[in-house]
Amino acid sequence: MAECFRGGKRMKLILLFFLVFAQSPIYAQDNLKFPIEPKMAKEWKYQSDQVMGGVSEGDTSLMQDGDMFYLRLTGDVSTKNNGGFVQFRSKISLFNKPKMFQLIHKTNKEGKGLEGVRLNVKGNGETYHVMIRTYFTWSPSDYYYHTFETSSNWQQVDLPFNQFKSSKYRQRGLEVGQIRDFAVVAYGRDFKSDVSVSEISFY
């Protein structure tokens, strides 16, 4: 009877071990989904080319559609005065490291197992950019980028990290575990911006 009890106890421990460690990757992946919520909207800041003398104008607003919240970037992009962008961005600062970056850096050995970023978006049919900066890109003109198309309906777009392009010739490849700045940008030409994002996730 004692041997049977000890055997049953061992089986329970083995089962507990399996459940904990088998579920851990799923838990980690679930935590790499970042729906836009009021409590985290403050981590996203609007910025335009006016910081460098441009004349583009716009705004980022927290909107709601039923139970879903989203960030909406609207404005007039102008290439006058060497400008040409409006954006909303989240970044690591000296005093703040948003949860999104914390989990990217902790997941899959500093992010090396992640394959791309997925957005739930809608817009006005224009083309927009995701721009990423890492600890190796400190100049404002150094970044990695990927474009995506929009329509008037909500849709998911996948942007594989190995398809991100560098703004600089011979810049080292994008190292996911080093991401420090993430932006959704209306960029590069004269047009009206209207793009909404309800969720950002990493896969």
Language-model-derived ranges and their functions:
Residues M1, F21, Y46-Q47:
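Exposed boundary/loop context
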Residues I26-Y203:
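Beta-rich carbohydrate-recognition modules and glycan-binding surfaces
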Residues I14-A22:
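Sec-dependent N-terminal signal peptides
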Residues R10-L13, P25:
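Generic short N-terminal amphipathic or hydrophobic helices
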Residues A2-R10:
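Short, Lys/Arg-enriched N-terminal segments with co-localized hydrophobic residues
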Residues M1, F17-F18, S198-S201:
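Short alpha-helical "patches" and their helix-cap loops
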